Amino acid sequence: MILASGSPRRRDLLANLGVPFRVVVSGEAEDRPERDPARLAGELATLKARAVAQSHPDAVVIAADTVVALGEELLGKPADEAENWAFVRRLAGRTHQVYTGVTVLSGGQESGGVERTDVTFRALTDGEIAHYARTGEGLDKAGGYGIQGVGMALVARIDGDYSNVVGFPLTLVIRLLRGAGVAVWGE
């Protein structure tokens, strides 16, 4: 099986399912005109899976992509500390949505889905935001924060799948893998 993602968080979560795999990064661009976050997450996951499957047609390929939305605004990965600060400032005291699309390709069959989780940040001071931005933790993450690290201190509430906010919704992943005939947890 191939994980079409360079994300260390996705790699760790998939490894915890006891599924042997290797990583092949798709190189697929994440910049698309689609503005609906659920459709965008699903479309990007599918494009990544298809890109890797072209070179590995006999493998089961799984890909994922995460999109963070605050109202109509999509928050990608911040370019630098200043943009990271601005993202967290916008999220402070508000509820946003995290969408992760997952696609599995196996034997010419394609299946996928999108998971949504609502995340509410607590009210934050400018000093707290600056401290978090300086950690650099959010620079490689959609929305500019990592819930599995220090970023958990920013969060007041989660409604939905925690692993979705990490970037790999395990309930959806397990369902899709089993549907493709992949044994999970030594089944």
Swiss-Prot record:
GO biological process, one term: nucleotide metabolic process
Cofactor list: a divalent metal cation
Matching SUPFAM superfamilies: ITPase-like
EC number of this enzyme: 3.6.1.9
Compartmental location: Cytoplasm
Active site: 65 (proton acceptor)
Keyword annotations of the record: Cytoplasm, Hydrolase, Nucleotide metabolism
Keyword presence, Secreted: no
Highest taxon above the source species: Bacteria
Main location: cytoplasm
PANTHER family xrefs: BIFUNCTIONAL DTTP/UTP PYROPHOSPHATASE/METHYLTRANSFERASE PROTEIN-RELATED, BIFUNCTIONAL DTTP_UTP PYROPHOSPHATASE_METHYLTRANSFERASE PROTEIN-RELATED
Function: Nucleoside triphosphate pyrophosphatase that hydrolyzes dTTP and UTP. May have a dual role in cell division arrest and in preventing the incorporation of modified nucleotides into cellular nucleic acids.
Family named by the database record: Belongs to the Maf family. YhdE subfamily.
Protein name stated in the entry: dTTP/UTP pyrophosphatase
